[in-house]
Amino acid sequence: MDFIFTLFYFRFLRESSFRNLLYWSKLQRTPRFYAWAGISFEILAMNHISQVKQRLGIAGVSTNLYSWRSKSSGEADERAAQIDMVIERGDNTINLCEMKFSEGEFAINKDYDKILRNKIARFMEETKTRKSIQLTFISSYGLQRNMYSGIAQNEVVLDDLF
């Protein structure tokens, strides 16, 4: 957790004089803030892997935890892909974890559904895995139910981490 505060300090506090009383109010809606919040949320989730496993019902299953990035980029439909967290399980299942910080329920739309399907396809193709793949969505407040939300077989929310 110290790293999250250190990241926050160097991003927002170190060069601030705090003379502007609205500094924090204005900062909260900037791309810079959301980038920090996203990275911090990913670190938080990774630091709470025991709670993630508990929520997934795999607390007693041996696992390897890592991030993954595809080796190459192909055509538009086969772009390079990156998986935030991979949980490779001893029961021949792999959870591909997509992590998203949001201020409410996260909505998967048609374009994002295509990105997620590409990530799964690239992972399976490049790793040549024969294990069962489950997309797991880790987010602040869960997924908004819509025609695309069914792509995620599992869901973990911020409250599950504590």
Task: Name these PLM-found stretches.
Residues 1-83:
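Accessory nucleic acid-recognition modules appended to NTPase machines
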Residues 8, 94, 144:
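Flexible, glycine-rich phosphate/dinucleotide-binding loops
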Residues 12, 98, 108, 147-150:
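Short conserved micro-motifs at the rims of enzyme active sites and ligand-binding pockets
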Residues 49, 81-103, 116, 135:
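Conserved catalytic cores of phosphodiester-cleaving nucleases, focusing on short active-site segments
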Residues 54, 58-59, 122-130:
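Short mixed-charge
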Residues 102-122:
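Mg2+/Mn2+-dependent nuclease catalytic core
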Residues 129-162:
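Domain-level recognition of nuclease-like catalytic cores that cleave nucleotide substrates
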